[in-house]
Amino acid sequence: MGALLGKYKKAVMYFPGGCSIGARPIDLHLKGFEALGAKVTNEKNKYIVEAEELKGANIYLDIASVGATINIMLAAVRAKGTTVIDNAAKEPEIVNVATFLNNMGAKITGAGTSTIKITGVDTLHKCFHEVIPDRIEAGTYILIGALCGNQLKIDNIIPEHIDSLLSKLEEIGTELEIGADYVIVSKSDRYKSTNIKTAVYPGFPTDLQQPFTVLLTQCNGKSKVMETIWENRFMHVPYLIQMGADITVKNQTATIIGPTALTGSEVVATDLRAGAALVAAALIADGKTRITNIEHILRGYENIVEKLTSVGAKIESHEI
C-alpha cells in the first residue's frame, strides 16, 4: 500500500488475512498514511487510501511494527519534506528495505534504530539489490539440526541476525560452529532446560518460538516459554502433547517438562510456524507422522521437503 500510495497517490486493498495466530490489525499503517496527508475510507471489505499530495510528518508508532515501519517508509520516500518515524522497528528487514530504497535514490537515515528519518524525493531509479537471507528459515533449520543433526551446515545466512537464538542454543548445550555466513550444528546428548520470552528484534523472535518449543521437549527439567507478541501462538502444543510431550499452557506461558519421547501421529499445521514445529517434531518422533494443511508450511519454506530429504530426512509430500 505504501508504494502504491507514494507513486500513484491511491491504493485499494481488501482486508488482509494471514496465519490465524491472533488479531492482525493494520491501524498503525493507516495512521501513518493519514499523518502523511492521506484519506482512508472503508467500504465493502476493502480499504481505499488516497491523497492529492503526501507531506512529511512526525509519526510515533504505538507498537514497533515491522510492516507499518516499512509501509510508511515506502510512502514517505515520495512525500514532500521530511518524515520522522519514532519507535520504529529495528529488524534487519527494515535495514535491507532502507538500503534498497537508498540505492534507488531515496534519502533514509536511521534504519535499524528506533528513529528513522526520510527526506522525500521526486523520483526513484532502478538499481541492483541483494535481499538478505531469511533469518527465520535459517533459525528453523538450525533448530532441526539441534534436534537430530550431525554436523548439519546451514549456509548463506547472517548469524548476527539470529544472535538471540544462537545464544539460547549455546546456553542449553548445543554443539555449534558459527562462521561468517554459516552455522554447523549437531545434536547434543544432554540438553539443559531454559526459559525464553519472545520480543521484538533484537529479542527472541516469535517466529522461532514454536520450533524452539519442540527442542525444549528434549531438554532435562522444566522450561518456560512466554509469548508476548501473538495471542494464538501455541496452536501447535495440543499436537505435541498428542505426540507425547509434557506441556501445559496458562495465559501466554507454556511450561515444558522434559525430556520426553515423541511418537508419530496425525497432526494439523494450523499456521506457518506451527507447521514448521510439527515437521521438526516428526523428524525425531518414533514412527510415521502425517501432517495436513501443509500449504501453510510450503508458502514460508521454499523447497523444504527437498532440502530436508537431501540431508537424510524421510519425507514424502502428497496432494490430496
Model regions: which residues?
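Structural preference for solvent-exposed beta-strand-turn elements
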Residues: M1-I320
